[in-house]
């Protein structure tokens, strides 16, 4: 398979709206060629006996039982707040009222 050309890199750069210098075109052409070669080697692996998966290992959620535990009172939680109102943290308004 022929390598990636400067023109192909320039085309990709235009599509991505990137401005590349002439020396960068050569540099990225080599890098893209290496990446495509690596993907081609992975594609050559015998995969007929391997089922498609989204992860190499099975995923399991580790859950703990819900337990009621002591926590802060509203007064304790608000004690370090710079501003509070009606037992709530008061923060500056960031959204309009529209």
UniProtKB/Swiss-Prot annotation:
Pfam families reported for this sequence: GatC
Superkingdom of this protein's organism: Bacteria
Reaction catalysis annotation: L-glutamyl-tRNA(Gln) + L-glutamine + ATP + H2O = L-glutaminyl-tRNA(Gln) + L-glutamate + ADP + phosphate + H(+); L-aspartyl-tRNA(Asn) + L-glutamine + ATP + H2O = L-asparaginyl-tRNA(Asn) + L-glutamate + ADP + phosphate + 2 H(+)
MF terms in GO: asparaginyl-tRNA synthase (glutamine-hydrolyzing) activity; ATP binding; glutaminyl-tRNA synthase (glutamine-hydrolyzing) activity
EC code(s) of this entry: 6.3.5.-
GO biological process: glutaminyl-tRNAGln biosynthesis via transamidation; regulation of translational fidelity; translation
Keywords carried by this UniProt record: ATP-binding, Ligase, Nucleotide-binding, Protein biosynthesis
Record's keyword annotation contains DNA damage: no
Entries under InterPro entries matching the protein: Asp/Glu-ADT_sf_sub_c (IPR036113), GatC (IPR003837)
Keyword set includes Transmembrane: no
Stretches for region Disordered: 70-98
HAMAP family per record: GatC
Assembly, per entry: Heterotrimer of A, B and C subunits.
PANTHER family from the UniProt entry: GLUTAMYL-TRNA(GLN) AMIDOTRANSFERASE SUBUNIT C, MITOCHONDRIAL
Family indicated by similarity: Belongs to the GatC family.
Function: Allows the formation of correctly charged Asn-tRNA(Asn) or Gln-tRNA(Gln) through the transamidation of misacylated Asp-tRNA(Asn) or Glu-tRNA(Gln) in organisms which lack either or both of asparaginyl-tRNA or glutaminyl-tRNA synthetases. The reaction takes place in the presence of glutamine and ATP through an activated phospho-Asp-tRNA(Asn) or phospho-Glu-tRNA(Gln).
Name listed for the protein in its UniProt record: Aspartyl/glutamyl-tRNA(Asn/Gln) amidotransferase subunit C
Gene field: gatC
């Amino acid at each position: 398979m022929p390598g990636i050309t400067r023109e192909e890199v320039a085309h990709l750069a235009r599509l991505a709206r990137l401005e590349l210098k002439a020396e960068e075109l050569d540099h990225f052409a080599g890098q893209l060629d290496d990446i495509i070669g690596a993907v081609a080697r992975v594609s050559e692996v015998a995969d007929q006996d391997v089922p498609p998966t989204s992860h190499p290992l099975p995923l399991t959620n580790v859950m703990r039982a819900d337990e009621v535990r002591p926590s802060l009172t509203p007064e304790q939680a608000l004690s370090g707040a710079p501003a509070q109102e009606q037992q709530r943290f008061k923060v500056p308004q960031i959204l309009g009222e529209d």
